[in-house]
Amino acid sequence: MTKTAGLRGLGLLLLTSAACVGTAPPHAPPEAATSRDAATPPPPAVAPSPDGARALDVTREGGVPLVEVPPRWPAPGSRLMVPEVRFPAGFGKRRIYLDAGHGAEGNTGTRSVTCEDEEVFTLRAAEDLAQRLEATGHFTVRLSRKAGARVPYAQRLAEAERWGADVLVSLHSDSRGLAHTWSPAPGQECFRQDETPGFSVLWSEDATPPLQTRRALLARALARSMTRAGFLGYDGMDYTGLYAVDTAQAGVFVSREPTHRQIFVLRKPRIPSVIIETHHALDFEESARWREARTLETFAAAVAQGLVESFTVPKE
């Protein structure tokens, strides 16, 4: 998405604009030490676990045995569980139009904490996901663009409908909150904000009731599957005024007319469509995790299972 840190929940391609442009706040200086620092109690003792994670020591009072507290996504060592994808009898083969977000003329998306353009990440993630979905034998996938191509969004939607896609899934990475500048490498400067990790899935209510239902079902199934796999759903603290919380499923947010964002790939398709904001691109640890093969493998299996459930679970 074309988002600039410093604006809250900067999201996506709007119907009326190819890019959302904002300004970032000045570099946030380190907080000065205060007298409270001296009064801060020492952290609890820790003990290593067999897999290298650290565990809270609750023996300090009462002699209770050590209890491991596993690290939470996206901390190093936090575990993802690759779900088993189960296809019911008669599922057949479904057509998935997979949009690698951005990549239109003048629309490279946001820049990550390592100064990578969003369009580069989304194409890499979409190509990997497409291969894994195709490998199941139950999905035929068409990508919205190839490396170096500048494809308008209207052209993508027209192609998806001509091809007869069952659903449209658009991949993006998010940028949220108030970020500060930093240098990940000599000669580079971009934004960083490590406080709001997590994925989100977006859908629009701007549709007929039957299409609304199918969009909601798809978004909720994908978010539910990603959560089960160990991904953290974003709480939406920076989405106020942009999207509404979908109370049926954590990690899902709704664009409602006329007050919320009018996002082209959400409101225009006549087939179910969602955006998956895979992660917070300005979070250093989370961005690093999305370069791991295990993350991509888990994501693909979670998406596959979410798609299966959206096609087979009774409408909500």
PLM features: residue spans?
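Catalytic-site microenvironment of enzymes
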Residues: 3-13, 20-316
